[in-house]
Amino acid sequence: MAGYLFVHFTGEQKDGEQIYFSVSRDGLHWTDLNNGKPVLYSHIGECGVRDPFPVKNPMNGRYYLIATDLRIEKGEGWQAAQERGSRDIIIWESEDLVHWEKERSHTVGIREAGCVWAPEAVFDEEEQAFLVFFASKVKCDGEETAKHRIYAAYTKDFVTFSDTFLYMERCLLYTSDAADD
């Protein structure tokens, strides 16, 4: 079937913070796969995922799916998730978008980060690597309160990553919000 794949989570209910797939031929009418049940589960970290982002490696054709390691449904709420949440991303890998390797995690958040949320990745031709960027809530020296900043790291294989660095200082939670400015 040629068309669109929608990779998503459904909310904060039981099994809502897992990975669901839906497909569409026209981008308007969608069919849930796997009878509307999660296609992928996270059994590591917080045992829940949000903000899934699929990406294809242009060098070898492999697919990667990265997501926020977060489970609000069983946790202490949003405030705790921002201040004491996971600093990991959850990663799945596939050759065909059907068969997926067991999930793994990687710590990309800096030591001072209260969370790592909404990871996305783009392939940087110049670096011949993926730039993985994400929001982290960090309190910097001289600040009264922590704020979300965008950090990033490079990876060629989603196994080893460069050191994490501050990518964008603007107060954004999702980098797609920057398009509105």
Regions found by a protein language model. Name each.
Residues 68-86, 137-144:
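Short, conserved, GDST-rich strand-edge loop motifs in beta-rich repeat architectures
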Residues 30-42, 99-109, 157-170:
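Blade-edge beta-strand/turn elements of extracellular beta-propeller
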Residues 2-5, 61-65, 127-132:
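Entry beta-strands of beta-propeller and related beta-repeat scaffolds
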Residues 102-124, 134-141, 146-151, 167:
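Asp-box/WD-like beta-propeller blade repeats and closely related beta-sheet repeat scaffolds
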